[in-house]
Amino acid sequence: MKKINHWINGKNVAGNEYFHTNNPATGEVLAELASGGEAEINQAVEAAKAAFPKWANLPMKERARLMRRLGDLIDQNVPDIAAMETADTGLPIHQTKNVLIPRASHNFEFFAEVCQQMNGKTYPVDDKMLNYTLVQPVGVCALVSPWNVPFMTATWKVAPCLALGNTAVLKMSELSPLTADRLGELALEAGIPAGVLNVVQGYGATAGDALVRHHDVRAVSFTGGTATGRRIMQTAGLKKYSMELGGKSPVLVFEDADIERALDAALFTIFSINGERCTAGSRIFIQQSIYPEFVKRFAERANRLRVGDPTDPNTQIGALISAQHWEKVSGYIRLGIEEGATLLAGGPDKPTDLPAHLRGGNFLRPTVLADVDNRMRVAQEEIFGPVACLLPFKDEAEGLRLANDVEYGLASYIWTQDVSKVLRLARNIEAGMVFVNTQNVRDLRQPFGGVKASGTGREGGEYSFEVFAEMKNVCISMGDHPIPKWGV
């Protein structure tokens, strides 16, 4: 059986204790995983701290070369990494192989360029003073990454962190550790010096908690649940934070929308990545005049989605990450029905047509709950699974009010041909990201993050400087400006 250890200071470090990680589709044990704690975190942070001065002072061009080299190695290993990710998470292979793992490579290529554009600004004050700013690395960063798209999200954090001259300790979710281990190995193969990137495996309550609280950690980039994010900010002390937390993103479909494209995007936005995505459009508001027809067609198409073996290229919905998470999502479906929603597709039970080797897997059919009231728990709480809540609305004012009537504010989606309406809604909707007449299409230059309970801070492009860089001002006298003569 494969044994997953830690990567600390360039070495593969065995753990004192191990636990199993399982394939969500079959239930089989994939690997034994080292269970790190405070001792391993201390070693990793010490290694990162020792490596920081030399790495931070490495010429940007050289750091960029190493980032590109790591991106190239990922490109060369896409099939293997994708297969590993699918086995570890239950995500369909066509999504890991064609989208998520290649995106990870792009992260390193992109930030290799960004790190060479770390230009400050100058502020002359008449002919007396010259101020200029320096963009400098923070130091040791804690990167805490989730289980839903682990490799892509890990590289989304590692790439800007290292490219900007920081060193890091990466802590992946204990539910999806395999590709993070591979990332640590590839980083060393790319020539990134020992100690610059350390990977510690283990549980969030032990390894994760020790990492974010460590006094030598200067910045924390966390992606995960809102409750955990709040706890980190309460206990970890005075650090820089980027918190990408939960979401309950609204989709507003107006009667003048391109209905075919809106249907395509709404289905994709909630059901891709098994519905386990923070930007999922899980509350779909449809204007009353088109509500019956839209709901009917949405449910028909949801019923036709292919659920099954994640390794089959034709599968669209794979297995949820764990049995515990399956119980949570299934429980929300039952709750929605109890609250009065109409079940039009899917349901809380496992599919009955699975082959024998998948019957122990965490499979759930894409579920459509119609006639949902926005006050229901299924409309207010993050389910994080393939469950779409469909709600009618009367007009623009009501649509906006309902969209904002939730504690989260990560992504939002607007479907209309009315440009004036788009401009009003984009300004007034409470979300960090607004997508108009499109699904979630990312550009690595754009800021990613949310408002309200969806987090704080932004990452992406130059916005990653917020957490991974410090701005220093230097003020130089250019002449004989007056200085007060005290004590003369």
Regions found by a protein language model. Give the residues of each.
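Conserved C-terminal structural/oligomerization subdomain of aldehyde/semialdehyde dehydrogenase
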Residues: 26-32, 217, 252, 306, ...
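Rossmann-like NAD(P) dinucleotide-binding subdomain of oxidoreductase/dehydrogenase enzymes
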Residues: 120-261, 393
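A short hydrophobic/small-residue beta-strand
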Residues: 167-169, 343, 433
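Hydrophobic face of amphipathic alpha-helices that form TPR/SEL1-like repeat modules
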Residues: 1-26
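ALDH superfamily catalytic-core signature
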Residues: 227-373, 436, 483-484
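Short, well-ordered beta-strand elements within core beta-sheets of diverse protein domains
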Residues: 29-36, 51-57, 143, 251-254, ...
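N-terminal alpha-helical segment of soluble enzymes
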Residues: 24-89, 289
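Long amphipathic alpha-helix in the N-terminal Rossmann-like dinucleotide-binding domain
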Residues: 46, 68-79, 93-118
